[in-house]
Swiss-Prot record:
Residues 148-379 form the Radical SAM core domain. The lineage of its organism: Eukaryota, Metazoa, Spiralia, Lophotrochozoa, Platyhelminthes. Pathway: Protein modification; protein lipoylation via endogenous pathway; protein N(6)-(lipoyl)lysine from octanoyl-[acyl-carrier-protein]: step 2/2. [4Fe-4S] cluster 2 binds at residues 165, 169, 172. It comes from Schistosoma mansoni (Blood fluke). Binds 2 [4Fe-4S] clusters per subunit. One cluster is coordinated with 3 cysteines and an exchangeable S-adenosyl-L-methionine. Gene3D superfamilies: Aldolase class I. This is Lipoyl synthase, mitochondrial. This protein may be expected to contain an N-terminal transit peptide but none has been predicted. It catalyses: [[Fe-S] cluster scaffold protein carrying a second [4Fe-4S](2+) cluster] + N(6)-octanoyl-L-lysyl-[protein] + 2 oxidized [2Fe-2S]-[ferredoxin] + 2 S-adenosyl-L-methionine + 4 H(+) = [[Fe-S] cluster scaffold protein] + N(6)-[(R)-dihydrolipoyl]-L-lysyl-[protein] + 4 Fe(3+) + 2 hydrogen sulfide + 2 5'-deoxyadenosine + 2 L-methionine + 2 reduced [2Fe-2S]-[ferredoxin].
Amino acid sequence: MGLLLPRGSYVFPVLASVSAATKRRAEWSYIKINITHSYSSNDKSSEFEEDNPTQKLSPEFQKAIAHGPSLSEFIKLSNNNQSTKEDFFSSPSSVNKSGKSLRLPEWLKTEIPCGGSVARLQKQLRSLNLHTVCEEARCPNISECWTAGKSTAATATIMIMGDTCTRGCRFCSVKTSPNPPPLDPDEPVNTAEAISKWDVDYIVITSVDRDDLGDGGARHIAKTIRQIKVRKPSIIVECLVPDFRGCTDSIHTVVRASPEVYAHNIETVESLQRVVRDHRAGYIQSLRSLETAKERSNRLVSSGDADFLVVTKSSIMLGLGEKEKEVMIALKDLRQAGVDCVTIGQYVQPTKRHLKVKEYIHPDKFDYWAKIGNDLGFLYTASGPLVRSSYRAGEYYIKHIIDQRKRKNI
């Protein structure tokens, strides 16, 4: 398929300031060529990240994250003011002169969700032993998405494979453990049953990472998608999935289940990957996962095994200390990987144990990034302080895109 490639390599120093080379790269023009893969054949992001000199973490901190941080490590981190790790998680730019965290700006304050649709959905979810990423990740849009309006239905986002993740990303409040409980074999059916009872026409199925499973949970996700389609064929399914550690077979398994949208988040710019995400995640690995999903979908359509080309989607958080040039590069990299839709939102610290906010981005700047995304050729760019990867404003637009693709059979 035709994708966009930059005239340059994908190498940045980790945790370093933006170099002159990086600035030049953001301004390079892009050429269109036909490719199969736009990245190296190796699936490990460590090769990309270690070939060049980087700012090394302290030995103590490297040891602490060797197997991914646990909840207890986060607690110790927040209570140890003398540790070098504490300095790593905060900086003078993330606090005011009094030493307190940045004050939440007015544009990020939302009403506390309660009663009505929120209470009803919570009760139904608990009765079926299901979990939502809205609750686990403390999303600020839970009330808006779960409450139906005059002209819109509530949008549901279900988190499957349990509520405990094997990874410990330092922005996420989902529980972590190297040995989470086994998968519930009845979950795909229970999930489909719950969704069939809701007045929704767009459902997001997301999950925790399950590195303890051979396929990363891909077959479980695929089974869930198929069960939903059996019970409610008209519904549009978006799957927001892990990177499966770069395993192409797992990606293919999910794509073959025919979700309309295949989403995977790169989360942040390249230089902050090791700061923000678990060490098993990686910038190139995430980009390659998205590209692989689109390529597989393209082959299924070409062979007549699928009726439409999957929409691919990713998300970026701002306010973690990223540079503007780096955000521009990340958006260009997503486009060249064939990503159709992107969401850009403000990072908000979920608890004191997690990464502090370096900057609250003004809404005008999010408008700027929305224009940049549209100029780069994304089918849809949702950009705003409260926008999250499953924000419903984008979902209705994506639904329109999918309907068009199905009608045209492309």
